[in-house]
């Protein structure tokens, strides 16, 4: 049976706004990422989660807006660049984390993961 989830990491995401470590636990984190896409009329989404220093997902420490709003930047032309904005996130516990940003495109029968990246952050009390 074919899976509706496939991964193709061709276009890298460019992080244009990210937190500067160290940050205090509970402080608002803003992240902006740009991604070049071939289909400007597609339906795109991005999601954030927290990983520990070993790359294992840590549930419950990253709070707030974990799904990004997005907008096209050049009017729907081919080779569009879209911008994902995470404006209201925070990490509730001190420690060393990676914030993983994953971008997806909705397709018939599911979603395709387009790319992912991580941002290292040190969180203090």
Name what the model sees in each region.
Residues 102-106:
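Beta-strand-rich extracellular modules
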Residues 1-56, 63-67, 77-78, 87-94, ...:
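N-terminal onset of structured domains
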């Amino acid at each position: 049976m074919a899976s509706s989830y496939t991964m193709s990491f061709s276009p890298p995401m460019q992080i244009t706004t990210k937190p500067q470590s160290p940050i205090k636990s509970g402080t608002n984190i803003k992240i902006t990422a740009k991604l070049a896409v071939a289909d400007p009329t597609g339906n795109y989404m991005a999601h954030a989660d927290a990983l520990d220093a070993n790359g294992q997902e840590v549930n419950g420490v990253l709070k707030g807006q974990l799904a990004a709003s997005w907008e096209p930047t050049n009017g729907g032309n081919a080779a569009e660049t879209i911008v994902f904005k995470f404006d209201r996130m925070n990490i509730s516990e001190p420690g060393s984390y990676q914030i993983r940003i994953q971008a997806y495109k909705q397709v018939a029968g599911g979603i395709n993961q387009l790319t992912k990246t991580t941002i290292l952050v040190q969180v203090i009390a």
